[in-house]
Amino acid sequence: MLTNDWLESFLTHLYIGKNVSPLTLQAYRNDIMQFMEIELNHTADLEKINHLTMRRYLAWLKNKGYSRRSIARKMSATRSFLFFLQKKGCIKSGKWSAVARPKIEKKLPRFLYQHEVLALLEVPDSRTPLGLRDRTLLELIYATGMRVGELVNLNLNSLQLEERLMKVYGKGNKERIVPVGQVASALLEEYLSSVRPVLAAGNKDGRVYEALFLNRWGSPLGDRGVRYNFRKYIQQVSHKDGISPHSLRHSFATHLLEGGADLRVVQELMGHVSISTTQIYTHVTRERLSEVYHAAFPRN
């Protein structure tokens, strides 16, 4: 079997066996193709891949200026592929596994304070259809902590408005049920009754879409559209660097913990597989406590 065939077999294994999302599959494909393009010029025989091969590739990535996080991801994808080949009997040696992956410095998530979130939510002009749509989806991200990718994949049947619940499909297509706050529920009802029908009527291709959020042409609103509009709104209320729609998700978790929510509950709401992913928000709240203390205590 040719190397490209093995790659397709590996990606199929991830998609079917591991339930990996299409976006993650594409990242795996790109990273492994890059490794194959660079290293198979040196080592035409897969069996000859060893720790020197991996070190050479690691050095190449560093020289190209990739960040530690990108290098760690690329090395992880490549190692997973090689482990797959070893399991299939295509390669026997595991010497390549001796090369350590670069350690990633954990960065505290960027979030907005509560007054900043409230200011952001007031920016869209709710008197217009698109403004009310944007106010609704911003409120929904903050009220549920969902990712933008999860938001744009919501369908009409995702909603259980009477129970104020929503079905969300996260990473790996894993389903979770999240509660929806009173304000977000009221906005959703208004959007569904007075805005979505107007947007749907603007569709010219004759198709009927089940997507919850539609663009001005009546088609499903995409990830790029959400991010574009967010940048337009956030620039009016905050000049912090690196603030994105994902910052609303970070704000959701941070504000819950500041309000006394249990860490395990926040983990479930966020859809985190590991509690360690959720624990980073405890560092954020401690930093906030320290900031408030030093600003308010008279003997500082």
Regions found by a protein language model. Name each.
Residues 1-300:
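Conserved catalytic core of the tyrosine transesterase superfamily
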